């Protein structure tokens, strides 16, 4: 049977949802008996947008700061075709982006 190395990178704005998908991937890997490394948390990217509170530009300069955090996880899986097929069937929530790189 052919074995592949898959690198799965997950990113999303809510860390609990990203961790839930990571746990599903870990469960599939343990059920099929393949080796897994991770999830490795990558640095959280913090995006801040300062916006003026006053719509007309008059008065004192008061600002609102809107923030969005992007959480990332990285998982390496030594998988066979059956495991990869099961990984493709995982329901991914709307707020999570997933990228799978496969090396043979």
Swiss-Prot record:
It holds the Pfam family Ribosomal_S10. PROSITE patterns: RIBOSOMAL_S10. SUPFAM superfamilies: Ribosomal protein S10. The keyword Ribosomal protein applies. The keyword Ribosomal protein applies. Keywords: Ribonucleoprotein, Ribosomal protein. GO terms for molecular function: structural constituent of ribosome; tRNA binding. NCBIfam families: rpsJ_bact, uS10_euk_arch. Belongs to the universal ribosomal protein uS10 family. Part of the 30S ribosomal subunit. HAMAP family: Ribosomal_uS10 (MF_00508). This is Small ribosomal subunit protein uS10. It comes from Thermoplasma acidophilum (strain ATCC 25905 / DSM 1728 / JCM 9062 / NBRC 15155 / AMRC-C165).
